[in-house]
């Protein structure tokens, strides 16, 4: 059991039989009242957020959270197959767990598989990936700076907004956290 006073961002706990990730935790004490710990928790299976206030004397059950480095191999039906780099074991991850992150899967890309109680609950990608632009409208001469953006389709099927000077065939760096353009990469 983990005292709620020790809760930190990134901890995984079990609450009412479900696993939650601590997004935020603040110790709060009003005058002449008991101290509380106010938390924001994310349900690891459903993805919804809740806010919960604990008495400072409470304890919660700590979940077994771990990460394993893996390499993407191929898609099979509605799941994706990864190989654990430590022991070469193959793991199937459902499309529901990946969600729109599937657009960052390139052959042999390395990711971190998040496990809670020996079950894959999430896939963490590198913060930036480099992808090639397969379609975008042509830019105009002189459009080298500015904040005007246009849509571009990338090699994996994802569409991101890019500056006007980006052309078909350019390689760009994309932020996987918010699907945004970062910069053009030299070939």
Curated annotation (Swiss-Prot):
GO terms for biological process: peptide biosynthetic process. Pathway: Protein biosynthesis; polypeptide chain elongation. It is found in: Cytoplasm. Its main location: cytoplasm. Signal peptide: none annotated. Keywords: Cytoplasm, Elongation factor, Protein biosynthesis. GO terms for molecular function: translation elongation factor activity. CDD domains: S1_EF-P_repeat_1, S1_EF-P_repeat_2. GO terms for cellular component: cytoplasm. Involved in peptide bond synthesis. Stimulates efficient translation and peptide-bond synthesis on native or reconstituted 70S ribosomes in vitro. Probably functions indirectly by altering the affinity of the ribosome for aminoacyl-tRNA, thus increasing their reactivity as acceptors for peptidyl transferase. Belongs to the elongation factor P family. This is Elongation factor P. The gene is efp.
């Amino acid at each position: 059991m983990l005292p709620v006073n020790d809760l930190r961002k990134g901890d995984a706990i079990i609450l009412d039989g479900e696993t939650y990730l601590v997004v935020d935790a603040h110790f709060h004490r009003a005058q002449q009242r008991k101290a509380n710990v106010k938390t924001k928790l994310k349900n690891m299976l459903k993805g919804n957020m809740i806010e919960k206030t604990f008495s400072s004397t409470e304890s919660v059950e700590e979940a077994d959270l771990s990460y394993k480095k893996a390499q993407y191999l191929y898609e099979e039906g509605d799941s994706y197959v990864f190989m654990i780099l430590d022991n070469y074991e193959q793991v199937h991850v459902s499309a529901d767990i990946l969600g729109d992150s599937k657009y960052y899967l390139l052959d042999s890309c390395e990711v971190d598989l998040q496990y809670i109680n020996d079950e894959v609950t999430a896939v963490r990608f590198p913060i930036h990936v480099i992808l090639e632009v397969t379609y975008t409208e042509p830019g105009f001469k002189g459009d080298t700076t500015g904040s005007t953006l246009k849509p571009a389709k990338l090699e994996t099927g994802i569409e991101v907004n890019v500056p006007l000077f980006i052309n078909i065939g350019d390689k760009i760096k994309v932020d996987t956290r918010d699907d945004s353009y970062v910069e053009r990469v030299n070939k």
